[in-house]
A protein has these predicted regions:
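Enzymes that bind and transform nitrogen-containing heteroaromatic metabolites
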Residues: 1-136
Length: 136
């Protein structure tokens, strides 16, 4: 999992290119907010559980974090989108087609979301980094 890999890279316990190590050190210093109904232990540095009502807790976090909150879970993204709590999407599209595996909104959404393109940047790998804002 990320919580064991990135701290090891930051400490130098895992082999990694310098740019990855630099990213790991920055990530280690950042606050991390965890949504879980089962976990009680959060060993990663600066980890904080989000408890109680998800809508209220995430809205408070958004209000307290004007630069934004990054999330990394398809299930959480689906639920936050359902609660209308996602303002922007940053997507990285790789030049591969997978005929199997999970999709971002595997269980679907209640309605269509209109998005406005903020930026699209092709990367050397062939992937495209795209930034969208919700059209309201």
């Amino acid at each position: 999992m990320m919580e064991s890999y990135w701290p090891a890279v930051a400490r130098g316990d895992e082999e990694a290119p310098p740019a990855m190590r630099e990213w790991a050190v920055k990530l280690e210093a950042k606050p991390k907010y965890v949504v879980s109904s089962t976990r009680k232990d959060f060993p990663w540095t600066n980890s904080h559980p989000i408890a109680g009502d998800l809508r209220t807790s995430v809205q408070k976090l958004k209000d307290a974090t004007p630069d934004g909150v990054l999330l990394g879970s398809g299930k959480l993204a689906t639920e936050l989108d359902r609660l209308d709590l996602i303002d922007e999407y940053k997507l990285l599209v790789h030049p591969r087609i997978s005929g199997h595996g999970p999709t971002l909104y595997e269980s679907g959404l209640a309605r269509t979301r209109r998005l406005e393109l903020i930026s699209a940047k092709p990367l050397r790998s062939g992937a495209v980094a795209m930034h969208y804002r919700r059209a309201r």
